[in-house]
Design a protein with these regions (language model features):
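Short arginine-rich
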Residues: 35-41, 120, 230-237
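Fold-independent oxyanion-binding glycine-rich loops
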Residues: 10-13, 27, 73
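Short alpha-helix boundary/capping segments
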Residues: 18-21, 82
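Internal hydrophobic alpha-helix adjacent to the cofactor/substrate pocket in enzyme cavities
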Residues: 22-44
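Short FAD-binding loop at a beta-strand-to-alpha-helix junction that anchors the flavin cofactor
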Residues: 1-18
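Active/binding-pocket-proximal capping segment
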Residues: 25-30, 228-230, 238-239
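Mid-to-C-terminal Rossmann-like scaffold of FAD/NAD(P)H-dependent oxidoreductases
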Residues: 39-104
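Extended, charge-enriched "interface" segments that sit outside catalytic cores
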Residues: 74, 80-82, 86-87, 91-95, ...
């Protein structure tokens, strides 16, 4: 709480609805209580590294007309926010919260991951690097890992993260490129009398706000409370297509 020192709130009082949302806020509140002098939660949990970070950012920056629920569509980095890479995403940031046993377990996992990655980078079949081969949907990392690698601790988990990251690599790069383009499209003009209902990927909440405020460009749309980054990407893409047709 900004007005009462050492008062940490979670759940409906913050404008959310749902057990998962409340549990996530409870976790953040607990961390805040235990580590408020040594950890800055807002800098550790961001839109780019966690769904909790997305939720917190939405709650503190947006005006809520209805109870908040966390959906994957709210996260612009959702292809990166996967359960298989949680150690890679968050372990370094939260190392102060880990016990020695937990830290050792994660270090072992990261070591296994590094060994598997190094082996793949140095392996080729018919002059084609294995990392490139794994981008194909029909390939599996198990086909290119030797028996000694498969005996490493946490091999299954580490190899799954590596393979998923390789197969998603192109999509993640495209996602990052779209986000960069969005920042450069703030001046893109939205035609007068534009029918926002034609954009089927927009949430009903976002559509209603856009119709009500009628922004003149993408920059104005980005400053409307409740408009998500994913909404802006869809809107800018649709507006550009309309401009080409006319």
């Amino acid at each position: 709480s900004k007005t009462v020192k050492n008062l940490f709130l979670a759940g409906q009082i913050n404008g959310t609805s749902g057990y998962e949302e409340a549990a996530a806020q409870g976790l953040v509140a607990a961390i805040g209580i235990l580590k408020k002098e040594t950890l800055n939660i807002s800098s550790l949990l961001t839109r780019g590294n966690s769904y909790i970070g997305v939720m917190i950012d939405d709650l503190v920056t947006s005006h809520l007309d209805e109870p908040y629920r966390m959906f994957t569509s709210r996260a612009e980095h959702r292809l990166f926010l996967r359960n298989d890479n949680v150690y890679t995403r968050l372990s370094i940031s939260f190392e102060k919260l880990l016990s020695k046993q937990q830290a050792q377990k994660i270090n072992t996992y990261m070591g296994t991951k590094e060994k598997i990655s190094k082996n793949l980078k140095n392996s080729s079949i018919k002059n084609e690097n294995v990392m490139q081969l794994l981008k194909r949907p029909e390939t599996s990392i198990n086909n290119y890992s030797n028996s000694s690698l498969k005996k490493l601790p946490f091999y299954n988990w580490a190899s799954f993260e590596i393979e998923t990251s390789i197969k998603y690599e192109g999509y993640i790069e495209n996602e990052q490129e779209r986000i960069k383009k969005l920042k450069s499209l703030e001046g893109l003009t939205i035609p007068k009398n534009f029918d926002f209902k034609k954009i089927k990927t927009l949430s009903n909440e976002s559509t209603e706000r856009l119709i009500k405020i009628k922004p003149e460009n993408i920059g104005q749309a980005s400053r409307i409370d409740g408009i998500r980054p994913t909404d802006l990407i869809a809107l800018s893409s649709f507006v550009k297509n309309v401009s080409r047709e006319t």
